[in-house]
Regions:
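Transmembrane signal-anchor helices characteristic of membrane glycosylation enzymes that use polyprenol
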Residues: 5-42, 50, 57-59, 68-72, ...
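Catalytic lumenal/periplasmic loop and adjoining terminal transmembrane helix
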Residues: 22-36, 86, 250-253, 259-267, ...
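Short acidic/glycine- and proline-prone juxtamembrane loop motifs at membrane-interface regions
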Residues: 39, 154-168
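Transmembrane-lumen/periplasm boundary regions of multi-pass, lipid-linked membrane glycan transferases
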Residues: 45-58, 82, 88, 203, ...
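Transmembrane-helix motifs of polytopic, lipid-linked glycan transferases
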Residues: 112, 116-137, 174, 178
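Membrane-interface transmembrane helices that cradle and orient dolichyl/undecaprenyl
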Residues: 136, 140, 175-196
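Short helix- or helix-capping micro-motifs
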Residues: 145-150, 157, 177, 201, ...
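Transmembrane-embedded, aromatic-rich helix segments that form part
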Residues: 196, 210-224, 303-308, 360, ...
Length: 544
């Protein structure tokens, strides 16, 4: 029953290797290809992950006792902004694999080692998607769905970061598959199946707050599918999930009511983040309602869009596909509600990508094998596609994505609906949210022993984290200082990070007489730029 096919294992291994090849954030004299630079949240995730893994190693099961939980999770050292499970995986990866990746001996943490945790989560997600699709629809769909997932630049881009998104995607898929398997039949799931489904939902809640979407989806689906017979499985589902969630996060025990509200974002006063959308700056809770739909569509690659369109041409959707559609649409609707914060491009709703991968894979295989579609829905028999057409499609969907995913800035890649990154820039979309362009290739252009002013600075620890965690910055003895936007008092080398939502408009384009010493660009789009300013330099003020 739990035997994994060779094809699913192979595509999962390929997913891991393609992601792991580009985890080099700034190593010195490394054989690893250049990857994305250190991004904004990685330092927090690694630090907290190592802290939790060390605590687990020190206390073992006693970590889940009241006194030890208070010492560990009540400490000022602990940061409860996210549930612990995703960070534990990153911390375990760091502790277990640091010895494999040399070059970070002088830094506080080995960032590439922690990034391997995301690569592993991505590979397991690919395995689950491939195996489920294979068992449900056949080997061709399983492989094609996996290829669709691997070929999504934003998905594999996040898999190269010590971020929570890849682990969240894994937990989301793990919690979604029992629903697709047991909750799409004519009869409702058994009590055992409902409890297991609920436990996996609890694991998802322990990974990231997006887990709160799933029970709403389950209630809507079950009510429509089973009517009054949904009451029993829903009750067991909810109880099991809640128990796993509370039992797995001892921080909740310290002050249950207030801490659960903090988890849900009801009591936490967090700083406002900003989006750059069609040439305008929006606060995260004031973005137009269509932001999630537009960002998703313009971020999807051509092969995914084509697969989805092919599936839409076949009018009949089976129950599994209908539930997959619901798992895509509902999170997008939530983030479209006025006042709900949304930022960082597709990051917050990246959980919809695995479902889209299955639907796109299904679209391609139904197009290549019309007889399968006809048999599945009792339609008239149609002729099979010629072998050369199938071979051409398989070659295209496996080879074409490589150019787009095997690049350091895959996480900032736009799709064909904007004609790529250049077209997205012309439309007024954000260049990059994560400062991932500050990688080895960029830092090698910065003079040694230099003091560099930086703008904008996204949080108070950003520059210290770069100095502490990026080996090439230490090796070249580069000192980073926040620029206070006063040319007469602070002048010299100035690093402009093109996060357009935070970069002052007058700094996005510079006067022609200013020297550009280093630049990170792709397809004509600027992501970061090092210039030299004098005390007499003045930038023309523009409205933001």
């Amino acid at each position: 029953m739990f035997r994994i096919s060779a094809s699913s294992s192979i595509v999962a291994l390929v997913a891991f290797l393609l992601a792991a090849m580009m985890i080099n954030h700034g190593l010195v004299d490394s054989d690893l290809p250049v990857g994305p630079g250190l991004t904004l949240d990685e330092s927090f995730n690694i630090d907290q992950g190592v802290y939790l893994v060390d605590a687990l190693g020190q206390h073992g099961p006693l970590l889940f006792t009241s006194s030890v939980a208070r010492d560990v999770f009540g400490s000022d050292r602990y940061l409860p902004d996210h549930p612990p499970l995703g960070r534990v995986l990153l911390g375990m990866s760091h502790q277990l694999t640091s010895w494999l990746i040399p070059g970070s001996e002088s830094t506080a943490y080995n960032v590439p080692a922690a990034r391997l945790g995301s690569c592993l989560a991505f590979a397991i997600t690919t395995l689950l998607i491939a195996e489920f699709a294979r068992r449900r629809y056949g080997s061709a769909t399983g492989i094609c769905a996996a290829v669709m997932l691997i070929g999504m630049p934003h998905v594999i881009g996040h898999a190269r970061l010590a971020a929570l998104e890849s682990v969240t995607n894994l937990a989301w898929v793990a919690a979604m598959l029992p629903l697709l398997t047991w909750w799409t039949n004519v009869k409702p799931p058994t009590t055992r199946q409902a409890i297991l489904s609920g436990c996996l939902w609890g694991v998802l809640l322990l990974t990231k707050v997006q887990g709160i979407f799933l029970p709403v989806i389950v209630v809507m689906w079950s009510t429509w599918q089973f009517r009054w017979r949904a009451i029993r499985p829903l009750a067991f589902y909810g109880i099991a999930g809640a128990l796993v969630f509370v039992a797995g996060w001892p921080w909740l025990w310290l002050d249950p009511e207030n801490n659960i509200l903090r988890y849900l974002g009801r009591t936490t006063k967090r700083p406002t983040l900003y989006c750059w959308y069609f040439g305008q700056r929006y606060a995260d809770s004031a973005v137009p309602w269509h932001f999630p739909f537009v960002m998703l569509l313009i971020s999807l690659p051509a092969w995914t869009l084509t697969g989805i369109l092919l599936r839409l041409t076949k009018k009949a959707f089976d129950p599994v596909e209908r539930l997959l559609v619901l798992c895509v649409v509902f999170p997008l609707i939530v983030f479209a509600v006025p006042g709900v914060p949304v930022y960082d491009g597709t990051r917050l709703f990246l959980i919809v990508m695995p479902s889209l991968a299955v639907l796109a894979g299904r679209g391609f295989t139904l197009w290549m094998s019309p007889k399968d579609f006809a048999a599945a829905f009792a339609l008239a028999v149609v002729s099979e596609r010629p072998a050369w057409q199938k071979a051409l499609v398989w070659t295209t969907i496996t080879i074409a994505p490589l150019h787009w995913i095997m690049q350091p800035l895959a996480i900032s890649q736009y799709g064909p609906l904007t004609a790529g990154n250049r077209g997205a820039a012309w439309l007024g979309m954000e260049a990059g949210y994560w400062s991932d362009a500050l990688n080895s290739r960029f830092w090698q252009q910065v003079p040694e022993d230099s003091a560099v002013l930086v703008a904008p600075v996204s949080h108070q620890f950003q520059l210290n984290d770069i100095e502490a965690l990026v080996p090439i910055v230490q090796h070249r003895r580069i000192k980073l200082v926040a620029w206070e936007y006063d040319e007469s008092r602070q002048h010299g080398l100035l690093l402009l990070i093109h996060r357009l939502a935070d970069l002052r408009p007058e700094l996005a384009t510079i006067p022609q007489d200013i020297d550009v010493l280093a630049e990170a660009t792709q397809n004509g789009v600027i992501y970061a730029r090092l210039i030299k300013i004098q005390s007499t330099t003045r930038f023309q003020q523009q409205p933001n």
